[in-house]
Amino acid sequence: MTAAKAMRKERTVPEQLQLERYNLAHSSVEANIETDAFEQSHADRIDESARNASDAESQQNNSDESPRQPIRAAVAKAAQLARGAEAHARERQHAKGKNTARERLDLLFDTGTFQEVGRFAGGDINQGVAGCAVITGFGEVYGRKVGVYAQDFSVKGGTLGKAEGEKICHLMDMAMSLKVPVVALIDSGGARIQEGVAALSQYGRIFKKTCEASGLIPQLSLILGPCAGGAVYCPALTDVIIMTKEHSNMFVTGPDVVKAATGEVISMDELGGGLVHNAVSGVAHYLGEDEADAIDYARTILAYLPSSCDAQPPAFAYAATRGEREMASRLADIVPENDRQPYDMLEVIRCIADYGEFVQVQELYAASAVVGFACIGGHPVGIVANQPNVLAGILDVNSSEKVARFVRLCDAFNLPVITLVDTPGYKPGSDQEHAGIIRRGAKVIYAYANAQVPLITVVLRKAFGGAYIVMGSKAIGADVNLALAFQPDCCAGSARSREHNSSQGSAKGQGTWSGC
């Protein structure tokens, strides 16, 4: 039975019951009239009964419509208020160079697939409020169901109160039950101070729900406006954070508080703008040119990920072209024979990825390591690689954190990890030791050693010292380990170089070695 038929059936049953009650009452009145007709002394009572019957009949007819009329009127009024609010929101948001919450939903989902949940929850038509400051619902991204909650800055500054918190938590529960991803569109002034601790407690509930969903379903956050105070931990707990060059801000304490507490004068963008969190702090994973670019990136990431940890990543039809086969054969030409000569690892990745397509993650952060998604033979994979073009592909505090975080994400959602190794080791220096290189390096080991997905490691030129062990080595659990072979003359030349360097080093009390 379709939902429409079920609704029609539910509406029909009460109408039948009301009709039966009406017939019963009407027949009872007629029986009384017939009985009283034999008693002439009670003529006045007959007239009174007739009048009462007439009134009852009129009241019964009115009662058939009375339960529905107020509801219909309320829904119509709420819809009218919603249309007016959307027009007002469009005017305000466009003046700031931003889209409305509903316009963002149109960009995120396949056309015509969004279905809202709890549209009028938290509203008060008597006060002229159609709904609360968050929109929740489900739609489709490339044909697969995805949940969303979008904060509406045009309603009370997008602040979070009891109604908003309950809607978000309900959406999270539904998404976990359905095992579908959740996308958060953040544009909020934080907790609604008028509601006091009750508003703050809603953040606690959202934190808990986000942690419960972590590793179960993919969670993406798009920062499309302000996100300050405790609210920043909502996106920080998700898998991927996307920001824009303008209007995106994240910070625990804002510029005014910083100035009052420390005397430092700093702008919102300098404190926690999109560029800062993509290139400096490493909090975010992508910096969009604008909202449309950021949302398109989110759609792309969702295309590589499964709907939940219980599902496999989607497979894509693929047939290698002649040009791609020729590109793959150029791999040995891209990697220089001299192990100290830099090259662009992205060229290597494009040689092995379907159609040469590679979606980088955290492109601007810790550039000596490269991570991202690609397809090989139509199957999505995660790729981790050293970047010889930046600091010779060395591992440091930030790149270790970047690699570990990405490997854990791939492992959570069943994506095989391909590791392309070309690194001279860990970056030396007191700054690295003081910043916790031991702790961060251990995270990389933990990520690889605990991964349950297929691990394939390819050593392109060199893998020295501790960096060799942590970068997906056989010793910590890689399933397949390969090495790119050089031409014999290259190896011979490198061997002669080692002998020459060794003899010189012996005279000086030290040796210099280079891999081939």
Language-model features, listed with the residues they occupy:
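Ligand-binding clefts of soluble mixed alpha/beta catalytic domains
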Residues: 2-516
